[in-house]
Curated annotation (Swiss-Prot):
SUPFAM superfamilies: Homeodomain-like. This is Homeobox protein Nkx-6.2. GO terms for biological process: cell differentiation; central nervous system myelination; negative regulation of cell fate commitment; negative regulation of DNA-templated transcription; negative regulation of oligodendrocyte differentiation; neuromuscular process controlling balance; neuron fate commitment; pancreatic A cell differentiation. GO terms for cellular component: chromatin; nucleus. Residues 148-207 bind DNA. Highest expression in brain. It comes from Homo sapiens. It holds the Pfam family Homeodomain. It is linked to Spastic ataxia 8, autosomal recessive, with hypomyelinating leukodystrophy: An autosomal recessive neurodegenerative disorder characterized by early-onset hypotonia which progresses to a pyramidal syndrome with ataxia, spasticity, hyperreflexia, weakness and loss of ambulation. Brain imaging shows cerebellar atrophy and hypomyelinating leukodystrophy. Keywords: Developmental protein, Disease variant, DNA-binding, Homeobox, Leukodystrophy, Neurodegeneration, Nucleus, Repressor. PROSITE patterns: HOMEOBOX_1 (PS00027), HOMEOBOX_2 (PS50071). InterPro entries: HD, HD_metazoa, Homeobox_CS, Homeobox_NK-like, Homeodomain-like_sf, HTH_motif. Residues 216-226 have a biased composition (Basic and acidic residues). PANTHER family: HOMEOBOX PROTEIN NKX (PTHR24340), HOMEOBOX PROTEIN NKX-6.2 (PTHR24340:SF21).
Amino acid sequence: MDTNRPGAFVLSSAPLAALHNMAEMKTSLFPYALQGPAGFKAPALGGLGAQLPLGTPHGISDILGRPVGAAGGGLLGGLPRLNGLASSAGVYFGPAAAVARGYPKPLAELPGRPPIFWPGVVQGAPWRDPRLAGPAPAGGVLDKDGKKKHSRPTFSGQQIFALEKTFEQTKYLAGPERARLAYSLGMTESQVKVWFQNRRTKWRKRHAVEMASAKKKQDSDAEKLKVGGSDAEDDDEYNRPLDPNSDDEKITRLLKKHKPSNLALVSPCGGGAGDAL
């Protein structure tokens, strides 16, 4: 080893010598990478084309000289085509291959549920966006059971006021009256008819409750009058002079109805308070 060369002591070890050889090899392989931007000179296109052999189909001049269809076919020639992929998939996943390999029947041929198709494949991505939902069905709004859901109409305060005033005058409307009222209120005849039917049902229930309450009150008043009349008759008998020898039953009945404090003052024999004491 020449020890007079500068840096010879650095290359005395085997690993450092290997690194030095790799650096020299890199310099010889990539001369343009080590030069500055000013010293870099791009090789001419004709020179590169001349260096490549004439039979090579991947040269720059050959690629640029091809038509568009031929270039695309040459570039994509190595990629597998869809038809080939489908045919190969049919070989592995077809019904004949399944039977030959001993697998059971495909899902489409099995009895029971129909094959499942994912919405993302059949309908595409827009089905996920609720803003792109389709219009409502023409038959009206459907509930969760699939039946048609009837929406209840709402009336304004002016319409309800006019209907109530008309109902106070008459509980039933004839055909011309109903048509005239519906036209004046901006409603349909069926709406007016249904409103009067519901209003009559409500009125009958309220009227029945009021009649039952009035009858109950009347019966209570009659019972009070009856009880008050019997008390008045007893008071009249109590104020009358009684014969102690013949009116013992009346005296006993009157004593039972009055307060027990009067028992000490009146005796059945007609004696006074002094006799009782």
